[in-house]
Structure formats: structure tokens, C-alpha cells
Amino acid sequence: MCLLHISLPYLSCALLPGWYFDARPAASIVMFAAAEENDDPYPGKSGYNDTCELMDMDGAVASFDEGMLSAIESVYSIPTKKRLALPPPKAASPGALYQRLQGELGFPEGQTLLSAMEKWNEDMFSALPGHVDLYTEIALLSTSVDEVVRAGLDSLPTPSHYSPEVDLNAHGDEPFPEVPALEDDLEIYVISAQRFYLSELRTREEHYARLLRGYCVALLHYLYGSAKRQLRGSGSDASLMHKFKQVVRDRYYREAANLARLLYLHLYVSVTREVSWRLHASQVINQGVFVSLHYFWAQRRKFECLFHPVLFNHGVVILENDPLEFHDLQRINYRRRELGLPLIRAGLIEEENSPLEAEPLFSGKLPRTIGFLTHQIRTKMEAYSDAHPATPLFPLAEHSYSKRIGGRLSYGTTTEAMMDPPSPSAVLPGDPVPPLTVGVRQTAATLAIPSNLTLQSMETDGLDYSSMTGDELNQMFDI
């Protein structure tokens, strides 16, 4: 067995509310060449003739439903154009700011998806990078009420524009990967696809962080006016500051978290849609090369993650050391359809006359998808205070994205924070993400072929085609 180790900055992980472990973003990708011996592993619907020993690769990929080539794919077939954000919002009620943000993002389904995720169990977010470094200097997100109040007063009056500008369709520097013609180049392709996605996500989040700050400023200015109105013009400056701090403590953190939840759900879903449909458009017409790819998800959360660099896993697919089962594929495809993402295809395990999707069952005893998203957001919004340890720790128990302090729960703590881990050996979102491992079937480029070996010499030695499996024949003709 030939091993090739390639460094890969794979998706880092976040933590589930209430469970705290160190996240380790580094990972590697391991490519190995392994000869497979399968007698017609794609029977029936997948396009292979049961009476023919030679695998018909073109027929196999042609049989896959191309109904996924839809209007959605055509929209994302090219990079999205620059789309500048509206001017920073002025002071307005939390409800008005929420509606404005939803309209500015063009995300009418946002609240519906957030509500639906209350009844989902899939971990779609903990394998995504947190990018907490983007938030370490945003004092408006401090867990200290005093610091938030000072930052809010310093931001008066409301700026007329963002500086630098906020582009809601900002793109990264990585080039879009093209599907290789040869399976020998698959490992490079998988690395490139992931790098492209991570670059797009990172760049877009830089702009979204500035957008969040603009909405937090507007929210604070509204709360400042609310404090003034409650005093009705009476009282000293000290009374006004006391009232303002009380209003911030009671309302700011909760409302800021609501805005952030909508904003970052849109970030993750929109970037993943764009990249995934572009990948789908290029992969769907080149599916044959992926028959040689062996894909391994060491943890279920990596399989449930929003982003998949390969959408046509027609080779061997392994989930947590066992062959991927069709019902698992159906369930994750059901969620992907709800999110507007292309389905994952896997020719070896798909069953004839069976739908590609099946609704997953929900368990109230397991963590919820909204909890994974909420904690991903918490890691960002707590970054300022984590980076400035002089900040008092006690306000952590006062706001809606707080951690557990001495076992106490804040009013905004999610259900997940009150739950014990599913089992002592369960993989938690804060655990290190293991390396992504994919394998490539041996080809002419990876096999050590004797220089004097020819097809004629093999026939002279008594080669019998009728006794060879289709995969063996494919390898021989590759040679």
C-alpha cells in the first residue's frame, strides 16, 4: 500500500453550548492506492449491464438523475456579482432592525429555517471554522456592560456609511478548482475544493462582521433613547447612565444574539449554496472520475456538515469505520434539500426505486441543530472578552450567549447547555476534527509496471478475460 500525506487546513470545530473543549483546526489528508476487486458493484439502476463483466463507466454516470440541473444551479454557475450593503441602520426597535436585516440579506426564509432547526438533530455547523480573530477588537460585543455602554456612546452619531465597505457577495483569492480528467489528480482536487470554500467563507465573514457591528450600534442607540424616555427627561446624567446600563443588561445581549443568529445562518447557507452548486455544475458532467474515489468520514458531524467538496461519491464510502448506509444518505439529503443544497450521490449504496431523501426522526433527548449554530455564534461574540482578560467575568451570567459559570444558567442558555453528553465516548463538537481521508483506486500512474509487460505477453501466458471482474479489466486497460 502506497501512502501519500498531504497537509490540509481542514474545517475547524466549535463547541456545543455547555460543553467546552479545545478546538484543533489542523488536519491532513491521506491518499492511498488500493486495488479493489468487486464483481459488478453497481447492479441494476446504476447503469451496468448484469450480463457484461466489463464495467460500463459512461453508462453508470449517465443513469444518474440530472434533474438537479435546475434554476438554482444556473444562478450559481458563475461567481456572484458585487452587492454592497445598505448604509448603516439608524436607531430602531429590535423588531424593526431584524426585519431590515432580513430584507437587506434577501433571506425571507431565514426565520422559518431557524424555527425548523429547533426540531433537527443534525450537527451541520461544528465542523466549520469559527474565525474568532475577526471579533477580538469589537468592544460592542464585550461581556462587560460598562464596556458596551462606552463603545455605544463612542459610536454616536450613527455613521453614514461603512468603512471599509461591506460587500455581501465578497469573494476570496483561491481559484475555483476544475474537475481533473485523471483520477491520479483527485487528491489535489479535493484539497483545492476545500481551500476554495474556506477562502470564500473567510472573506465573506470579514464583511458580515462589519455588518453585525453596524446593527449592534443601531440597537445600542435605540436602547439609549429608550433609557432617556423612561426617565422622561428627569434625573441626572448619573441616573441616565444607570438606567442605560440596566437596559443594556436586560435587552441588548438577547437582541444582539437574535440578529447574529439570522446573520450567520445566512452567511453559512449562502456561501455553501454558491460554492456547492458551482461544484455540482462541474462535477455532474464529469462523474466517471469519482468512481475511483474512496471517501471516509471519521465522525458523523463531518458527514452532516453543510459543505461537501465532492458531491458524487460513486466509489467506496465509509462513515465511522462502517460502510455508509443508504438511509443515512437519504436523511442528510432531506436536510440538504430543505436548505437548497445539492444532494449527495453515492452510486454504490443507492437502491433501485428508492427515493434519494427520507425525513429524519427528531429526538428531544439529543442536541438540536439550532444549538450547534448558537454556540458557533457564541464563540464569535465572546471573542472580545476572551482576548481581553481584564474584562470582569461576572457579566457572563447575565446575557444570552453566556457560558456556564459555576453551574449557573443564564436566561438565554440553550437546551443543549443543560444536557449531558449522549455517552462518555460520544464525539462532542469541541473535540478535535480528525483528518479527512480519501483513497484513490490504483491506476497506471500509481502501479509499478514492468517495462517488458504487454497485453500480448499476458495473452500468450494464458490470460482468460472471462474469469476477470469488471474492475480488474478496467485496471488492465488503464495500463
Curated annotation (Swiss-Prot):
Name one cellular component (GO) term: host cell nucleus
| Pfam families reported for this sequence | Alpha_TIF
Q: Which GO terms describe its biological process?
A: DNA-templated viral transcription; regulation of DNA-templated transcription
Tell me the InterPro entries matching this sequence. Alpha_TIF, Alpha_TIF_sf
Q: Which UniProt keywords apply?
A: DNA-binding, Host nucleus, Host-virus interaction, Phosphoprotein, Transcription, Transcription regulation, Virion, Virion tegument
Which SUPFAM superfamilies does this entry report, sorted A to Z?
Conserved core of transcriptional regulatory protein vp16
A GO MF annotation of the entry reads: DNA binding
The compartments listed are: Virion tegument; Host nucleus
Similarity annotation: Belongs to the herpesviridae tegument protein VP16 protein family.
State whether it acts alone or in a complex, and with which partners, per the record. Associates with the VP16-induced complex; binding to host HCFC1 activates VP16 for association with the octamer motif-binding host protein POU2F1, to form a multiprotein-DNA complex responsible for activating transcription of the viral immediate early genes.
Protein role = Transcriptional activator of immediate-early (IE) gene products (alpha genes). Acts as a key activator of lytic infection by initiating the lytic program through the assembly of the transcriptional regulatory VP16-induced complex composed of VP16 and two cellular factors, HCFC1 and POU2F1. VP16-induced complex represents a regulatory switch: when it is on, it promotes IE-gene expression and thus lytic infection, and when it is off, it limits IE-gene transcription favoring latent infection. May play a role in the aggregation of tegument proteins around nucleocapsids during virus morphogenesis.
Instruction: Tell me what this protein is called.
Output: Tegument protein VP16 homolog
Protein source organism: Equine herpesvirus 1 (strain Ab4p) (EHV-1)
According to the entry, what is the taxonomic lineage of the organism?
Viruses, Duplodnaviria, Heunggongvirae, Peploviricota, Herviviricetes
